[in-house]
C-alpha cells in the first residue's frame, strides 16, 4: 500500500514539473523567435530619432543655441539623434 501511494505521488510530482517546464519553454520560444522583427521597438527608435532632431531644429530656427533635448530610458542626444547609451 505504501509503495503504491509513493509511486502515485512520485508520478504526480514528475507530471507537474514536466508540465511547468514545458510551459516555460514554450513561453521563452515565443519571446525569442528569430526572423520576426520587433516592430514596436523599431517604431520607438524612429520616434526617438525624430523627436530629438526636430526639437533641435526648432530651437535653431528661433536664433537660439541648440540645446539638445534629453532622451529618456537609456538614450542620449548626439548629433541631433537619440542614441543608446
Curated annotation (Swiss-Prot):
Matching entries from InterPro entries are given as: Hwtx-2-like (IPR012625)
Indicate where this protein resides in the cell.
Secreted
Principal location class: secreted
The cross-references to Pfam families, in alphabetical order and at most eight, read: Toxin_20
Keyword Nucleus present in the record's keywords: the answer is: no
Chaperone as UniProt keyword: no
An MF annotation (GO) of this entry:
toxin activity
Q: How is expression of this protein distributed across tissues?
A: Expressed by the venom gland.
Q: Which region is the signal sequence?
A: 1-22
A single GO cellular-component term on record:
host cell postsynaptic membrane
Q: Propeptide spans which residues?
A: 23-48
**Disulfide links within the chain:** 52-66, 56-77, 71-82
For this UniProt record, the keywords arranged alphabetically read as follows: Disulfide bond, Neurotoxin, Postsynaptic neurotoxin, Secreted, Signal, Toxin
Family from the record: Belongs to the neurotoxin 12 (Hwtx-2) family. 02 (Hwtx-2) subfamily.
Q: What does this protein do?
A: Postsynaptic neurotoxin.
Q: What is this protein called?
A: U4-theraphotoxin-Hhn1u
Natural source organism = Cyriopagopus hainanus
Lineage, uppermost ranks: Eukaryota, Metazoa, Ecdysozoa, Arthropoda, Chelicerata
Amino acid at each position: 500500500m505504501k509503495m503504491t501511494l509513493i509511486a502515485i505521488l512520485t508520478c504526480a510530482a514528475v507530471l507537474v514539473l514536466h508540465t511547468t517546464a514545458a510551459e516555460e519553454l514554450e513561453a521563452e520560444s515565443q519571446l525569442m523567435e528569430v526572423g520576426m522583427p520587433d516592430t514596436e521597438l523599431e517604431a520607438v527608435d524612429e520616434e526617438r530619432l525624430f523627436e530629438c532632431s526636430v526639437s533641435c531644429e526648432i530651437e535653431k530656427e528661433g536664433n537660439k543655441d541648440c540645446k539638445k533635448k534629453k532622451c529618456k530610458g537609456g538614450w542620449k542626444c548626439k548629433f541631433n539623434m537619440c542614441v543608446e547609451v
